């Protein structure tokens, strides 16, 4: 397992989660995609327009997920899940709460990049330029929407000196 990213008790408290099962003390990452999940990650079963992360719990377990964050509403349909769970009212809202906790615990200088063109290029240029002055955390790929920004924040290491987030704007609010 990689370096600890989150203490599970702190995670559960931040997300207002109910623990179920034998939870690990820490997790090393946050994932919403079983194809990129690494052993020791917490898997967030986000429900989207075309998919439901709850359908991928078995794949997440096989990939090495340390725990699953699942919706209370989906719990009856899950049957007997062998992995530890953090049960929440809404998985995306819980991830947003964890993102708020990540921001609150960080002393990093935060840079938000937005606009209609060039966000990813600007974010990457800043990441490379700031790296000489300390540890930089930057959102992966173009994670700039209503789930990508909180996901990127939840992955913010405590010791990052800088954090760069790409923020898209596709509608008011």
Locations of regions flagged by a protein language model:
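N-terminal leader/targeting and accessory segments in enzymes
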Residues: 1-97
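Phosphate-binding loop of NTP-binding sites
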Residues: 94-173
């Amino acid at each position: 397992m990689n370096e600890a990213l989150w203490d599970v008790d702190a995670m559960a408290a931040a997300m207002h989660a109910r623990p179920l099962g034998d939870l690990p003390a820490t997790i090393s990452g946050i994932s919403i995609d079983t194809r990129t999940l690494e052993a020791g990650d917490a898997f967030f079963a986000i429900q989207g327009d075309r998919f439901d992360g709850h359908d991928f719990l078995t794949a997440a377990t096989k990939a090495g997920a340390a725990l699953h964050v699942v919706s209370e509403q989906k719990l009856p349909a899950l049957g007997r899940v062998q992995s530890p769970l953090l049960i929440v009212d809404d998985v995306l809202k819980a991830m947003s709460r964890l993102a708020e906790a990540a921001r609150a615990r960080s002393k990093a200088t935060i840079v938000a990049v937005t606009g209609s063109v060039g966000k990813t290029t600007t974010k990457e240029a800043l990441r490379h330029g700031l790296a000489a002055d300390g540890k930089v955390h930057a959102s992966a790929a173009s994670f700039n929407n209503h789930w990508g920004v909180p996901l990127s924040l939840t992955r913010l290491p405590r010791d990052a000196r800088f954090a760069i987030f790409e923020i898209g704007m596709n509608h008011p609010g």
